[in-house]
C-alpha cells in the first residue's frame, strides 16, 4: 500500500505532533498549513490519503475535499473537526470523505480511520487487478 499521507491543518502544533505520530507509524508525511498549499503538494505527488482540518482560513476542508475528489476520486480523505460541528462532518461525508475524526484527536480513533482507508485502497487495487486479469482472458479467447 502507498504509505504517503498529506496532512493539512492551520495549527502548527497539530501538524507537528500528528506528523511525528504518522511517521512513527510508517507513513511518509507531507504537511500543508492551508488548502492552496495542500493542492499544490497534492498535484506534485498525489498521496493515497489526505488528512485535513475542516475549519481553515481561505479554503476550508470541505472545498479542499471537493477539489481533491474532482481531480482524483480514489483519494481517501479523512476530515478533522475541532468544533463539535456534526453538520460539517455530515456534509464532508456527503462529499465522499472516507471518515471524520473529532479534535482533540484520539490515537485509536485515528488509527481505525487510517486502517479503514487502507482497506479501501487495497480493495480497489485487488478489484483493478482482477478486472485486468479478466480483460486479458477475454482478449485471449
Q: Across the structure, where does each feature detected by a protein language model lie?
A:
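Charged docking surfaces used in two-component/phosphorelay signaling
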Residues: 16-24
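Receiver (REC) domain active-site loop signature in two-component systems and cognate sites
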Residues: 56
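C-terminal output helix
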Residues: 87, 101-114
Amino acid at each position: 500500500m502507498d504509505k504517503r499521507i498529506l496532512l493539512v491543518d492551520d495549527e502548527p502544533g497539530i501538524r507537528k505532533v500528528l506528523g511525528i505520530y504518522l511517521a512513527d507509524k510508517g507513513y511518509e508525511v507531507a504537511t500543508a498549513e492551508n488548502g492552496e498549499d495542500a493542492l499544490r503538494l497534492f498535484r506534485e505527488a498525489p498521496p493515497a490519503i489526505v488528512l485535513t482540518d475542516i475549519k481553515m482560513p481561505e479554503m476550508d476542508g470541505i472545498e479542499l475535499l471537493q477539489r481533491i475528489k474532482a481531480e482524483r476520486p480514489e483519494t481517501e480523505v479523512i476530515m478533522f473537526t475541532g468544533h463539535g460541528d456534526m453538520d460539517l462532518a455530515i456534509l464532508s461525508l456527503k462529499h465522499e470523505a472516507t471518515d471524520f475524526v473529532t479534535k482533540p484527536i484520539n490515537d485509536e480513533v485515528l488509527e481505525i480511520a487510517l486502517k479503514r482507508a487502507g482497506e479501501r485502497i487495497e480493495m480497489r487495487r485487488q478489484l483493478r487487478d482482477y478486472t485486468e486479469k479478466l480483460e486479458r482472458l477475454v482478449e485471449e479467447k
